[in-house]
């Protein structure tokens, strides 16, 4: 199975980590990377305080995301990274570092997003930033390498749907 480097994207609470980890269990020689772990401490503190990040805040983080993908690919692994990648310009920045990146936008109903964020424990992204993220989100354009997948059903079904859509798109 030939799978490109994947960016599982969307707003907080859409299931990026769950889907990404599920994909890694199905894709040989793959590695899961949580882009949240690549944020500088100052970004984490801003978000924890309920302050939305600016594009300037995100720039070094997006570069680190692209480098992490490129490094994994160079090591012979298929990176599967959970990363919001909300704007086209952010995705282009990732593509500049990893030109083979393929984006999977997880599309989740707003009420479900709110429920998920309220139930989360030990995550620095407060539910109060959901509106900011939804306002920032730019859906994938037809010329971008990626697919949008509606998130319905149990997590395992979503993983299978995502994998099928990625393989069909290639």
Regions found by a protein language model. Name each.
Residues 8:
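Hydrophobic anchor at the beta1->P-loop junction of P-loop NTPases
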Residues 21-66:
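Conserved substrate/cofactor phosphate-moiety recognition/catalytic segment
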Residues 5:
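Walker A (P-loop) ATP-phosphate-binding motif of ABC ATPase nucleotide-binding domains
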Residues 56-98, 106:
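Glycine-rich phosphate-binding loop used to anchor ATP phosphates in small-molecule kinases
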Residues 16:
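Conserved lysine of the Walker
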Residues 11:
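P-loop (Walker A) phosphate-binding loop of NTP-binding proteins
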Residues 97-117:
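Conserved phosphate-donor/acceptor-positioning beta-strand/loop module used by diverse small-molecule
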Residues 119-161:
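Small-molecule kinase domains that catalyze NTP-dependent phosphoryl transfer to phosphate-bearing small molecules
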């Amino acid at each position: 199975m030939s799978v490109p480097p994947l960016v599982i994207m969307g707003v907080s609470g859409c299931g990026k980590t769950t889907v990404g980890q599920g994909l890694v269990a199905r894709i040989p020689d793959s590695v899961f990377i949580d882009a949240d772990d690549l944020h500088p401490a100052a970004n984490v503190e801003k978000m924890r305080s309920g302050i939305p990040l600016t594009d300037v805040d995100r720039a070094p983080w997006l570069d680190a995301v692209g480098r992490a993908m490129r490094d994994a690919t160079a090591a012979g692994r298929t990176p599967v990274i959970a990363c919001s990648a909300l704007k086209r310009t952010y995705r282009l920045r990732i593509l500049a570092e990893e030109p083979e990146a393929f984006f999977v936008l997880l599309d989740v109903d707003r009420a479900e997003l709110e429920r998920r964020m309220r139930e989360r424990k030990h995550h620095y992204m407060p539910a109060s930033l959901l509106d900011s993220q939804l306002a920032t989100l730019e859906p994938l354009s037809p010329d971008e390498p990626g697919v949008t997948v509606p998130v319905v059903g149990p997590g395992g079904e979503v993983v299978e749907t995502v994998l099928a859509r990625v393989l069909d798109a290639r």
